[in-house]
Amino acid sequence: MTSGSYLGIVQWQAAPLRPPHLAAIAPSVMGSDYHDGNVYVNGVFSLWLSQSWPAGAIIPDQMFRAGQSSAQVNAWNTLVNENLFTNWVWQLPLSGFSEFHQFASFYYDWVAHPNYDAYWAKIDTSTRYPDITVPALVSGDWYDPFQVGTVQNFQGMRSIGGSAKARQGTRLVMGAYGHSGDSGTPTFGDDTPDPSIQMRFYDHYLKGLDNGFESDPIVHLYVLVPPNSGNTGSGFWITGDDFPLPGTQIANYFLHSGGHANTRLGDGVLAGDEDRHDPRYRAPADRFDYDPEDPVPTVGGNMCCNGVLLPAGALDQSAVELRNDILVYTSTPLPHDVAVIGTVNATFWAMTSARDTDFTLKLVDVHPDGLTHNVLDRIVRARFREGSRLPPELVEPNQPYQYTLELGNTATILRAGHQIRVEVSSSSFPHYARNLNTGLDNNSTEAVLVAHQTILHDKEHPSFIALPIVPNVTIPSS
């Protein structure tokens, strides 16, 4: 079996059933846990995915199947293009949205199941790896919305797949772009993988050829090379024996400021271990207000679908960084190239005036010419701070809590002269549904409160991003 997206789900659902004639699977751009990392992310509803995908990919097909005319389908598509971005995503409550009842009623099931429960467990790939006895050629892209689950599928199959053949034969191929390409800038060249990877996999497991596939590289990773100026970057492929790559080192960069890190014009600093006690950065915290009626707009990122209305991928962040509800922490220019390859994690301390709220972190590359681009971003809901599979627990207002957040996976060169930047806020809309800050069910209510947020970064509450650094990975000479 082969193909991607929804057809990737089909493969992951079929393989645990062990159909007798299934020899191998090759799923692409699809995750593992369809609750966390798909319809929800750390407890937050993936609003854009959950509305744009049914509106564009499911409902037109269902209309044709129901006997509706091309004119009716065209009228629907016009309705979507006129209303999805400007109207539908703003409607509250989420459960009151009425456009999908006839042809995409599963949307309301998604909204009705914000917690991981039996609804999600029955389709959860991440619990079924021991039942899968065939190898998987797993592929994805760094700007795909399901890349966290893609990597998890590879890791799960390699470690606990249901047969030696499944464990030893599973491979990972990660390219550059989004779910169906993307319109982002900068670009990163042609990330088409070597076609022999697939052919050798198929020849070995479908035809039974003794072609030495077992000795081929385990992972193939496309490394992004951003430009120093302009919007034309490049990239190159590397191989390895695992993901993360053996020999990966972790470098922590700490959030600091003089107490006014709001906007990219503020005094936020991202400092390495050697500079974390610099007396210039003595302010213990930064503050901002999060208003659900004026959320931070989504600018690029790992999204699906309808990139015409909401572009995905790498985009310049400099305009949105002028908002006062975004804290911005920037390093000094890097003295040499740094290969960041692996899983990026963040640990931070936060307080809120609300019983529940969200926090977002974004990793940004600042180019020497002043342009920027997002590398990774992620969100976490306060009530799910201990994990999306555990019972949600509201926070006590104005009390500090530690959050750990996996931003995702990447392979990029942070080039000499570039700066590392971290943005902290509480929304990315309409990528994610807004937390209304009331502590009530965000999916079935519409009352909103403004939350007063504090990010702590003193000695007792260190907040930092952890970057996976791989030595000796350099940009090939042209």
Locations of the language-model features?
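Short beta-strand immediately N-terminal to the catalytic nucleophile in serine-hydrolase-like folds
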Residues: 1-3, 139
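Short glycine-enriched nucleophile-adjacent loop
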Residues: 8-19, 348
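Accessory cap/linker subdomain of secreted extracellular hydrolases
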Residues: 16-131
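Short beta-strand/loop motif that positions the catalytic acidic residue
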Residues: 132, 138-140
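Acidic catalytic loop of the alpha/beta-hydrolase fold
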Residues: 142-147
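Active-site-adjacent alpha-helix of alpha/beta-hydrolase-fold enzymes
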Residues: 148-169
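Glycine/threonine-rich phosphate-binding loop and adjacent beta-strand/alpha-helix elements that clamp
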Residues: 165-166, 194, 206-478
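Histidine-bearing beta->alpha loop at or near hydrolase active sites
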Residues: 168-185
